[in-house]
């Protein structure tokens, strides 16, 4: 407008032409603006329609999204509740498992300690077992030796009984011989009133041997009259001759009495040996049950008796031959009874 006011026209026509051109120019501008406005309105209507459509779509999507959001919120709340419940349950379970774990660890430690103690006790028991086995073997060995010793002593005891029977028989025979000697002396007294010094010495020796049977005597091999009694059978024959009425020589009578004294001494020695062996057995096995020992001794005794019952021959003569060693047996005497019972070990005391 300042430019238009500053314009100076030369004439009115120039001014009119100028203003007409300006008016045409503005008119054209207004038409263009109107056209642009119409185009803009049409475009804006189109945009508005599009925007409304988009708005409707967006609102629909928003409604869907909102409903979905509400559903998801509800699901989230339910999941949170479930999570809290599960978390509480898991917490309780974890606390319970932790308590169980601590208890299990304590039990495991106790069991490991108990296992170690059991292993130590097992080792101790194995050592004690080995020691017990060794002591048991030693004890069984000693017990077997004692049983064998007892079996041998029982056989010795049986022989002792046989010897005692023989001694008793010999005592009876000696008594009969003394009576017979007294009768013969009474018969010979009227014939000879004077007794020789040699006969007195013999009678004195006979009486001394009868009064003291256990006195130490010289062996049979050193006696002067041993030649007449070199075997039990000849000794028995001499006694039979005495019973038949044939007078015996004083030397034979003295030898018979000496044999009786030897028998008595050996019987006493056997009794002392038996007592010492019994004491030895009691000292060696004080804690052994008596039933098992007695059972085994009874079995051994039965076996020995069975084996001894099989042997043939006179037990008295065999006991005399075995224990007293009078002399060699005659050829017709069986040697089966002289053998030791099988399984019996002779122990020198």
UniProtKB/Swiss-Prot annotation:
Q: Where in the cell is it found?
A: Cytoplasm, Cytoskeleton; Cytoplasm, Cytoskeleton, Microtubule organizing center, Centrosome; Cytoplasm, Cytoskeleton, Spindle; Chromosome, Centromere, Kinetochore
What the entry says about post-translational processing? Answer: Phosphorylated in mitosis.
What InterPro entries does UniProt report for this protein, alphabetically? NUDE, NUDE_dom
Molecular function as annotated in GO: microtubule binding
* Family per similarity comment: Belongs to the nudE family.
Tell me, in a sentence or two, what this protein's role is: Required for centrosome duplication and formation and function of the mitotic spindle.
What is said about its interaction partners and assembly? Self-associates. Interacts with pafah1b1.
Q: What name does UniProt use for this protein?
A: Nuclear distribution protein nudE homolog 1-B
Native source species: Xenopus laevis
């Amino acid at each position: 407008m300042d430019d238009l006011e500053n314009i100076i026209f030369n004439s009115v026509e120039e001014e009119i032409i100028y203003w007409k051109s300006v008016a045409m120019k503005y008119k054209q501008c207004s038409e263009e603006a109107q056209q642009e406005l119409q185009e803009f309105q049409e475009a804006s209507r189109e945009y508005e329609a599009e925007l409304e459509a988009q708005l409707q779509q967006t609102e629909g999507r928003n409604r869907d999204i909102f409903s979905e959001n509400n559903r998801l919120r509800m699901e989230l709340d339910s999941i949170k509740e479930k999570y809290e419940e599960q978390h509480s349950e898991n917490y309780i379970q974890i606390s319970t498992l932790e308590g169980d774990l601590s208890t299990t660890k304590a039990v495991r430690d106790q069991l490991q300690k108990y296992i170690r103690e059991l292993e130590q006790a097992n080792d101790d028991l194995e050592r004690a077992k080995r020691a017990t086995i060794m002591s048991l073997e030693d004890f069984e060995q000693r017990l077997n030796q004692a049983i064998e010793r007892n079996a041998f002593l029982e056989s010795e005891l049986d022989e002792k009984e046989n010897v005692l029977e023989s001694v008793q028989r010999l005592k009876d025979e000696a008594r009969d011989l003394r009576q017979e000697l007294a009768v013969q002396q009474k018969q010979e007294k009227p014939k000879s009133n004077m007794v020789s010094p040699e006969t007195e010495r013999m009678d004195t020796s006979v009486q001394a041997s009868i009064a003291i049977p256990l006195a130490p005597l010289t062996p049979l091999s050193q006696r002067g009259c041993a030649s007449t009694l070199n075997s039990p059978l000849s000794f028995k024959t001499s006694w039979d001759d005495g019973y038949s009425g044939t007078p015996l020589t004083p030397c034979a009578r003295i030898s018979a009495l000496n044999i009786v004294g030897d028998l008595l001494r050996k019987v006493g020695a056997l009794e002392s040996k038996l007592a010492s062996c019994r004491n030895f057995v009691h000292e060696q096995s004080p804690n052994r049950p008596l039933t098992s020992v007695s059972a085994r001794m009874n079995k051994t005794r039965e076996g020995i008796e069975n084996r001894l019952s099989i042997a043939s021959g006179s037990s008295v003569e065999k006991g005399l031959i075995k224990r007293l060693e009078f002399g060699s047996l005659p050829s017709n005497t069986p040697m089966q009874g002289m053998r030791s019972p099988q399984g019996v070990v002779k122990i020198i005391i």
